[in-house]
């Protein structure tokens, strides 16, 4: 499993549209604790999601939601060129889940090491054609670590259970 931190921030207004970012989907800053930001463009909600994976996420693991919120607001303010106080004043809600500390996941996503594609096939192999496994970690067609991979593996298992030609 790879570590990742995902932080949802809801604001009173879409503060990222105050500059030339009106039609932005992603913002990226290599040097910050939360380097990646994305919105649900073309939907124009006042919600932005921060994403830190790998070594960047380690700086946030085990922190309280308040500590993560302060770090995230600071990172977002820097990437937008705004004052942290301005951003914090417009913040209405924060959602943060510590996937690393979650006893049911103990991480956030899978990734394949070089030469490791066979492990995904092994993880997705049914046991005596009665117990089937799905999930992005069992997806070997190039979409591991993604929602797309989770869905594709679910379709694969559904087809295997239903039998040939039953699910299209």
Model-derived segments and their meaning:
Residues 1-6, 11:
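Flavin (primarily FAD) cofactor-binding/catalytic cores of flavoenzymes
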């Amino acid at each position: 499993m790879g570590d990742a931190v995902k932080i949802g921030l809801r604001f009173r207004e879409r503060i990222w549209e105050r500059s030339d970012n009106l039609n932005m989907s992603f913002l990226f800053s290599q040097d910050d604790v939360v380097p990646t930001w994305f919105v649900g463009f073309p939907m124009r909600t006042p919600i932005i999601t921060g994403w830190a994976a790998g070594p960047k996420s380690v700086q946030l693991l085990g922190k309280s939601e308040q500590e993560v919120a302060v770090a995230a607001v600071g990172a977002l303010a820097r990437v937008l060129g705004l004052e942290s106080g301005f951003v914090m004043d417009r913040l209405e809600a924060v959602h943060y889940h510590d996937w690393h500390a979650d006893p049911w996941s103990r991480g956030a996503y899978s990734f394949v090491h070089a030469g490791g594609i066979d492990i995904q096939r092994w993880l997705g192999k049914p046991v005596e054609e009665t117990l089937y496994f799905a999930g992005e970690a069992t997806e070997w067609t190039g979409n591991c670590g993604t929602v797309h991979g989770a869905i594709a593996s679910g379709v694969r298992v559904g087809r295997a259970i239903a039998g040939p030609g039953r699910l299209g």
